[in-house]
Structures are given as C-alpha cells and as structure tokens.
Design a protein with these regions (language model features):
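Conserved donor-binding/catalytic core segment of Leloir-type glycosyltransferases
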Residues: 1-9
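Short glycine-centered, acidic/aromatic-flanked micro-motifs in structured strand/loop junctions
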Residues: 3, 36, 119
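Pocket-edge positions in alpha/beta enzyme catalytic cores
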Residues: 9, 58, 119-122
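Nucleotide-sugar donor-binding patch of glycosyltransferase catalytic domains
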Residues: 85-139
Length: 139
C-alpha cells in the first residue's frame, strides 16, 4: 500500500487505508502480508497505518528496492503518487485512486493489470468499493 502523498497535495490522499486493511485481513487472514514503503518524509506517518512499514535500517527504501518490492507484490493500492506510476510501468497488478486533482487518462497510468478508480472526492470513496475491485483482481 502507498497511502501517502506530497504534503502540499493532500487532495490526493485517500483516508480509508486502515479500513481497507481490515477488509483484507477479515477476508484473507494471513494469506497476504499488507505492507507499506514510506518515503523519507512519511516514516512517522506510517505509524498510523496498520501495515508493516518496510524500511532499510530505519530509512526509506531506495528506488531500486522500491521498484523490486512493487514488481514482486501480489497487488498494489496507491494514491496518485510515484509508486503508483512505478507499479503501472513494471506490470504490477493494482489500483490507483484519483480524486478531482487530475484523471488517470491525463497521466496515462492505466495498463492491463493496473487500473484507476476515479471519483470527485476521495473522502467519499469507501473502502468497500476499493476492496471489491481488489478482490476482483485477485480471484
């Protein structure tokens, strides 16, 4: 999971990652390990996410480590951030969440295995909808 965004672009931040994590845990138990890889300025914020934060000796993963993690993930869910674009371009399965800041079409992020959910307001996008799309990919 990549639940973070630039501090000056909080409009890109979906607030229901912990709800999604609960849905994943309730349905799949320990079948999938839910992790996040915070950037350097996101390490403290990662403590608020109910997922394992992957770090390299207390520091953010470098771009090579991050790309490897994404490429080897079963599924990625991300805000419209750098890791989402990496996921799309390395062929990872996943979803990226877009509010009104831009469209998936404008940034050319959608691929065969990587799709977007576009809504007017990310605050109104419920975890159940994201979870439903996620489970469709995994089944």
């Amino acid at each position: 999971l990549f639940p973070f965004c630039s501090p000056h672009l909080t409009i890109k931040k979906w607030p229901y990652y912990n709800n999604l994590i609960k849905n994943i845990s309730d349905k799949f138990g320990h079948e999938y390990k839910v992790v996040t890889a915070p950037g350097p300025s996101e390490i403290d914020d990662a403590k608020d996410i109910n997922a394992l934060a992957l770090l390299d000796n207390g520091r953010a993963l470098d771009i090579s480590q991050l790309t490897s993690l994404i490429k080897n993930s079963s599924f990625v869910v991300a805000n419209d951030t750098g890791p989402a674009h990496i996921a799309a371009h390395v062929g990872a399965k996943g979803l990226t969440l877009f509010g009104k800041h831009t469209t998936a079409y404008k940034v050319s992020i959608e691929r065969e295995n990587f799709k977007a959910i576009q809504v007017t307001d990310l605050n109104n996008l419920k975890a159940e909808k994201v979870f439903e799309r996620l489970t469709n990919f995994l089944s």
